[in-house]
């Protein structure tokens, strides 16, 4: 099933163009229900957790978590998306270059609770912003080019602090009917990408088919949420 999308490639410029043209059907104006439902499982009794949002867009989930006392670091290629996040949430923000990543900028709210890096995700590393106690991956693994998934998994694992709890949202559908993105990521691939380094637990599986996906030609869509934690070192 994976071979149907194996060679599909989206250039970074195409994602930036989608923001320029406001073709952002993937953006959700409300906090994602899967995050709200599984929040306690991720926080696990901790307060002031550092959260990482790969390919963050202007997700309102980031403000929600900051308002709950956590801090958020996101990475996004589109400067427009980052500016819209701060403007639409009425946050004053600063803008600085990132010496460790040529051409990158970091935008931060005045409270310092939200820091968004404008750069290629694969230019980012723990050397730039440390490791994280939580990760919310909605629209990231399913958006990167399928051929980059091994590299992506290695990056994400390198960003996980020992106590990190990684909430991963994936989509199941018939890839013969739609070429993506968002791409089809079966549970077996989650296991093959992360299983050697992480314990993987399926938390939730829901029917997520809407008229938007029907317009893509799909007749079924399942959304799965997994919780990944680093395996104890031997």
Regions found by a protein language model. Give the residues of each.
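Class I (Rossmann-like) S-adenosyl-L-methionine-dependent methyltransferase catalytic domain
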Residues: 2-46, 58-62, 70, 74-128, ...
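Nucleotide donor/acceptor-binding cores
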Residues: 48-50
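A short, conserved alpha-helix within the catalytic core of class I
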Residues: 143-155
């Amino acid at each position: 099933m994976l071979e149907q999308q194996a060679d599909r490639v989206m250039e970074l410029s195409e994602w930036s163009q989608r923001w320029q043209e406001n073709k952002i059907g993937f953006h959700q104006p409300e906090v994602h229900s899967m995050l709200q439902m599984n929040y306690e499982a991720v926080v696990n009794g901790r307060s002031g957790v550092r959260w990482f949002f790969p390919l963050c867009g202007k997700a309102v989930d980031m403000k929600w978590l900051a308002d709950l006392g956590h801090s958020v670091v996101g990475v996004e290629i589109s400067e427009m998306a980052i500016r819209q996040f701060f403007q639409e949430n009425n946050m004053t923000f600063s803008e600085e270059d990132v010496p460790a990543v040529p051409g990158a900028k970091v935008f931060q709210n005045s409270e310092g609770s939200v820091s968004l890096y404008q750069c290629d995700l694969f230019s980012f590393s723990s050397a730039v912003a440390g490791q994280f106690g939580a990760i919310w991956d909605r629209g990231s693994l399913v958006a990167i080019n399928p051929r980059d998934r091994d590299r992506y998994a290695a990056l994400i694992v390198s960003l996980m602090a020992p106590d990190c709890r990684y909430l991963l949202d994936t989509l199941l559908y018939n890839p013969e009917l739609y070429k993506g993105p968002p791409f089809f990521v079966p549970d077996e691939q989650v296991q093959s990408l992360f299983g050697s380094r992480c314990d993987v637990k399926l938390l939730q599986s829901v029917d997520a088919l809407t008229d938007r996906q029907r317009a893509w030609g799909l007749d079924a869509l399942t959304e799965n949420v997994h919780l990944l934690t680093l395996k104890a070192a031997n």
